[in-house]
Amino acid sequence: MNYTDINAKTVDSWVQNGWEWGRPISHETFEKAKNGEWGVYLTPTKIVPHEWFGEMRGKKILGLASGGGQQIPVFTALGADCTVLDYSTEQLKREEEVGKREGYTPKCVRADMTKPLPFADESFDLIFNPVSNCYIEELEPVWREC
């Protein structure tokens, strides 16, 4: 088993034990986002300024290692066309739970971000990658893919 498989299993167990980054947003948070009241985190302590994103409606967004039902549902509520890629099965399940509850089908891809990404070049307008770089040995190949 390689280190990314071990990491995925570790994250799965954290999520099953109530890890804060594996707790999906509430219905109320989703509804607020639909009405323009929203915030997402890239790091644990500060909400990303809205102006970093620009207009979200119709924007194609990849949530890279962004499962958990926290950011991608917000972007979806804002009208973005979202795909989430994560190696944690439990994190992807949380995305699916939010989608089912809110009436949409999330595009979830289980893949290792240290490998070539399963998308054509320039498939996305924006890549959202919350803190996950600390779990991989070499960042350069990931950045080349992005």
Predicted feature residues:
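Conserved alpha-helix/loop element of class I SAM-dependent methyltransferases that forms part
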Residues: P24-K59
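A short acidic, Gly/Pro-enriched loop at the edge of an enzyme's catalytic core
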Residues: T114-L126
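Class I SAM-dependent methyltransferase SAM/SAH-binding core
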Residues: G54, K59-P116
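A short glycine-rich, Lys/Arg-flanked "PGG" loop and its adjoining helix->strand segment in the class I
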Residues: E140-C146
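A short SAM/SAH-binding and catalytic strip from SAM-dependent methyltransferases
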Residues: D125-E140
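N-terminal, positively charged/glycine-rich alpha-helical extensions of SAM-dependent methyltransferases
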Residues: M1-E31
